[in-house]
Amino acid sequence: MSPTLTVDDLAFEVLPSPRRKTVELTVERDGHLTIRAPEGTDDSVLTAFIQEKRFWLYQKIALKNSMRQAVATKEFVSGEGFPYLGRSYRLLLVDGQDVPLKLEAGRFRMPRAAAGNGREIFIAWYAEHALVWLRNRVRLFASRVGVEPARVEVRDLGFRWGSCGRAGTLNFNWATILLPPAIVEYVVVHELVHLHEDNHTPEFWQRVERALPDYKQRKQWLAEKGAGYVVV
């Protein structure tokens, strides 16, 4: 099994797992292609699977590209709106403030002199608040799912919302805190259930549904609108 696999004009990162029983294709929000497969799967098997899914792959790639193009670039000026837990708050640049960024009275407030580092400041603020919020939600839903994660971490996961580490660590993208609370809860439950099931099997989705009976609507919302929230 090679670490990468190219089939015609499609290049994939191959992610083997000794616990995986099925092959799964993923088109990340940036168009990056991954194929997850049981460890030791022959490249010819993966190639045949990809060829069978070619039409679906091209549809997904086109959709991701159109969603990325629709995202407007943010400017760190007074009046610009920035999302937090599904709501948009306007930025106000101020002349004096003791912290780089704070949300107060319905506005993000940032020292005017710090605007040049606005992206880094916002990401740090989002990551700090995401960790607190996500740890609370993980505690809430872990009992429903029947698992106990080792720890919760927030980091830059690129174009992934979350991941479940082998040691029981749940990793979440700092950008999850931009989404509406109900959608973040779906991301949390999704990763918690991965502590039971590596693969997206029928049993996996049954466990998700037991914790979130309306998960299908949340999942669809995330697929259709989530990319538009990564704006800084």
Predicted regions and their residues:
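Walker B catalytic acidic pair
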Residues: E191
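Active-site-proximal or metal-binding-adjacent scaffold patches in catalytic folds
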Residues: M1-Y186, L195-V232
